[in-house]
């Protein structure tokens, strides 16, 4: 049995198979949280759920008190350039660094975007996630979380050895 999800382009239905991974990373590229969605779901739909699950992160300087729950600023690509996403960030007090749709900015976002692209390539190195053998989210999400855990473990082990 095959499962298809349809989206409409003009008057013809197009079956879009596959999965998109939405990653929240720190500045070094360590994945903090990851979500998976169908390929035909728009990126901005998972913007708030991805940021709501942001774990507490202690900064480089050991300040007394609680660890931070929100970043100072957030870099995102054009898929998140919607007023709803911008309002959400303003309400939480996060500086908005989202690329504008229709405007080509070669130097600004690319300096930060490659970190996320590299992290996505680390996730896709796991064969079961890159090819997507699993049909249900119940089997995909644990594998995705395991991949993110292994990536963090390997990166932190490299830092510890230095």
What are these regions (language model features)?
Residues 1-101, 108, 162:
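Polybasic low-complexity intrinsically disordered regions
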Residues 18, 83, 87, 92-96, ...:
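Basic, amphipathic alpha-helical segments enriched in Lys/Arg and hydrophobic/aromatic residues
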């Amino acid at each position: 049995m095959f499962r298809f999800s349809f989206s409409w382009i003009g008057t013809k239905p197009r079956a879009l198979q596959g999965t998109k991974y939405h990653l929240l990373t720190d500045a070094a590229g360590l994945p903090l949280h990851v979500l998976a969605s169908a390929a035909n779901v728009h990126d901005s739909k998972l913007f708030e759920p991805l940021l709501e699950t942001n774990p507490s992160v202690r900064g480089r300087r050991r300040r007394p008190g609680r660890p931070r729950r929100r970043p100072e600023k957030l870099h995102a690509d054009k898929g998140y350039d919607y007023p709803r996403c911008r309002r959400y960030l303003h309400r939480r007090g996060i500086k908005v660094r989202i690329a504008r749709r229709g405007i080509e900015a070669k130097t600004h976002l690319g300096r930060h975007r490659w970190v996320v692209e590299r992290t996505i390539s680390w996730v896709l190195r796991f064969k079961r996630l890159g090819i997507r053998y699993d049909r249900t989210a119940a089997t995909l999400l644990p594998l995705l979380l395991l991949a993110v855990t292994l990536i963090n473990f390997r990166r932190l082990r490299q830092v510890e050895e230095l």
